[in-house]
């Protein structure tokens, strides 16, 4: 195969944005093991920085405040994204991939999926440029994103979107205004499959709510641009399961709302809790109070909507 004799050692970078689920309705388990979802995603401005430099060797590095527990190996989903792009370009999957983790790991904010989406974009741009290849089309990148995981297509797209199927079938949604979130992270993560399994158990025992698949209230609230209206529409079918597995999250939610948040929800499968606030000052008060009253928590203030994976 033809390729330049000496590809450059240029460093390429992309931002990988976190997400919050404004609505997460979970249907019954399908034959393939996945659950049918009706979810409304919104991208947040908190982001990881994913870097790639071509090399004949393979190196995966993880740095940053939330690096703990993230595999610095070729098992990392972001490296799998590099491999998929390299295969499409008929190139060897080698190089140095680095993730600076600012998104909590195993926190229900799609940090791993966001890194994979950024790696898709990054590898496509870097490798096609370095080796003078026709880049993978945008349509094909979306297909690769879906192959990698349910949240990867949205973290590639960004903005605000309705997700159906596993969450990978996306429709962009109108969203007026800017929404401010107080995000509370936890040192101990929650496994997404474990939370879904717990929801199935609760429903089988008659203790889980029926699937809430209607997203109209959230859609209308987003069009209004009123954070109070959006707060009233926030919903997560997985929240009872997450609270059953981690009762300590209930105190976090209660503390945040008592401190002035319009509404607090478990983000995705948890354990991260997201509090919608009327303004940044209130968000700062919420994170200060929650962290003071709950050991082992960390915090950040984020806004949405934000872009998807972005080259820098």
Per-region residue spans from a language model:
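Short, conserved aromatic-histidine micro-motifs
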Residues: 57, 134-155, 286-304
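Contiguous, small/hydrophobic- and glycine-enriched helical/loop subdomains that border
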Residues: 94, 116, 120-162, 166
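Glycine/serine-rich anion-binding loops at beta->alpha junctions
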Residues: 71, 98-127, 150, 261-277
